[in-house]
């Protein structure tokens, strides 16, 4: 099995997977979105490509230093071959750029972003890591090998980034369209030849790292990550002379505009469903209360009975939910039919109300302690990048933002506690609420939000008082059928995750699901061809992402 072109069970693969989100910020940069669309200003492209001269020179010198540090003759030979390939590319760069359809400027001045990476790489290759001179502390030739490993660790992510990003872009190209001016450049970095070079570099990193200590492997990991971040900085620093559709926050007028973010909670923000979390709180509380029968009036059932009841409720919900979805699907997929979708979702609304009534009647929510809920919420595992995105969005000072969480969750206190740190208490929560008596839940629920139509009503109530000019933009982020109407009503609907129920339901009613990156590439083409920055709500098109890094890169940039 492979991921991003990297084989399993290897150090290079481990690092790539761990820091792959950094590549998202490069891919979603104005530079690469414009390049992928074929509309990137040629001067901007040449300004970037001209920096290859400085990168290649730094690679060549670093390989030379790494070869001196390598202890094994086979490793020395492998490094020498890599250096030879770099020197050949440096020598033939003018010809290569000409084959891509461009001509390098006579003078290639190093920019600051390039200098930061090349200085970092050459310092690493010279044995200076984290501000300390490593070579001065080495006593044997064998120990010098780690400097060679450090050097390759600082080079390999640069190659993998190019291989990965261009392979993401290539499927978006029309094979019959010869007008895409960057097609040859993309094909060069998608080639088997470049993948072979990347793989050889990663294999060398793995081989050089075999004998290293855990502490030394940690150093390589830090160097690998630092190299990735410097690449992000490099592409973020590319001067853009054309209008671009991203980052979204750059497009908005900082004075007149407002960006309103709506978001689901369960499995969009969280790694686990909130009902399962509340079930676990109830069971743990019951186990604590079992020895003391004085609390039985609060818990009402033993922990074993409680676990069994939760299991029955959960199984029944899952089975009947799928049957409900199947029953409301049209026999054939057709054109986008919002009205028909609304009618179908009324049946789902009735199902959700009955399911909630069963939960209340079962008594499983009785006896929950508010402090337990808040403590669990504060420790709740959110999706990677979710908290960081919201922390950045609420602190952004150059435009107005408003953030709302719309959730079926039975307990608003759980959501508020999950966002209680990092200035996130400004997020407005719309959900159901548990009923308490002296901080102990009675088992009842204040049912504020039980259906897709109620979610839509809250959404519309929030946005109805705002003017409809282009500078007021709504973004909805969700991942279940409950979010479908809001996703379609928002200016931009972003589907997080891979809910098969959402896909099946949407597709049968004519909803299109488009990967966000490819949607941005098309939007950039439209903008360059005289289109506007405006996003069209109720278009029947939703945009899919697999990480919060994509959402952050799209809305805020790097």
Label for each model-derived stretch:
Residues 52, 264-266, 479, 483:
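Acidic active-site catalytic centers that drive phospho-/nucleotidyl reactions
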Residues 1-17, 21, 133-140, 239-258, ...:
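Eukaryotic N-terminal low-complexity, Ser/Thr- and Lys/Arg-rich leader segments
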Residues 48-51, 55-66, 297-305, 310:
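Glycine/small-residue-rich interface belts in oligomeric ring/scaffold proteins
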Residues 185-190, 245-256, 376-558:
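C-terminal cap/substrate-recognition subdomain and adjoining C-terminal extension
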Residues 1-55, 59, 68-72, 169-255:
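Terminal targeting/low-complexity segments that flank the catalytic cores of oxidoreductases
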Residues 247-437:
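Alpha-helical substrate-recognition element adjacent to the catalytic core
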Residues 61-64, 69-70, 271-278:
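Active-site nucleophile-adjacent alpha helix/oxyanion-hole segment immediately C-terminal to the catalytic cysteine
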Residues 6, 16, 24, 46, ...:
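Active-site-proximal alpha-helical scaffolds that flank and shape metal-associated catalytic sites
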